[in-house]
A protein has these predicted regions:
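A ligand-binding cleft/hinge motif common to bilobed small-molecule-binding domains
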Residues: 45-48, 62-70, 116-119, 143-172
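Short Pro/Gly-enriched coil loops immediately N-terminal to beta-strands
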Residues: 72-84, 167-175
């Protein structure tokens, strides 16, 4: 888990790891009769942890893509995301996915959001976490960022004066599942 991506996984005011994915993982562990052990890391290294056998599963808002499904077994979807293009409030240049062409964005490099941004012609700056992404956006160093619609609303709840907005939503929802090594029967 990243521990930096509210409302999925983040730290509360007492520095406890909390969020929707933490609750999902705890429920899975309870059903399996095991204790959940949470290991935090940067997004770009989490799937590699499954490859190396360091982690059994990754519960961190992982979109089920064709490419990932070729490499990992996935649980049934447990959530659906809509990708939001988030911009500064004054930005009226970006109003559709196609308007990302030639623009700058920031995301963790191996995320689905980075792939979508690149698909629409945006240049992606790699970041370590969500806070870094919003810092770049608010400072005007990038034109936009792509993320889950729910993540935007959660950020605005915590930062109601942030001068950002959703410019548009990708019309297609993504399915969120739990990846594990191919052939793992805990599915």
């Amino acid at each position: 888990m990243e521990g930096t991506w509210a409302p999925w996984t983040y730290h509360d005011e007492d520095d406890n790891l909390v969020g929707y994915d933490v609750e999902v993982a705890q429920q899975i562990a309870e059903k399996l009769g095991v204790k959940a052990t949470f290991v935090e890391g940067e997004w770009d290294g989490l799937l590699a942890g499954i490859d190396s056998g360091r982690y059994d599963i990754m519960v961190n808002g992982v979109d089920i893509t064709e490419e990932r499904a070729e490499k990992y077994s996935f649980s049934d979807p447990y959530a659906y995301n809509r990708t939001a293009v988030i911009v500064n409030s004054a930005n009226d240049e970006i109003q559709s996915m196609e308007d990302l062409d030639g623009k700058s964005t920031a995301n963790t490099i191996s995320s689905t959001y980075a792939e979508v941004a690149e698909k629409y012609g945006a240049a992606v700056t790699g970041v370590d976490d969500l806070e870094q992404t919003f810092e770049l956006l608010l400072s005007g160093r990038i034109d936009a960022t792509l993320n889950a619609e729910v993540t935007y609303y959660d950020y605005m709840k915590a930062h109601p004066d942030a001068e950002i907005k959703i410019a548009c939503l990708d019309p297609e929802s993504t399915k969120v599942g739990i990846p594990m090594k191919k052939g793992d029967e805990t599915k």
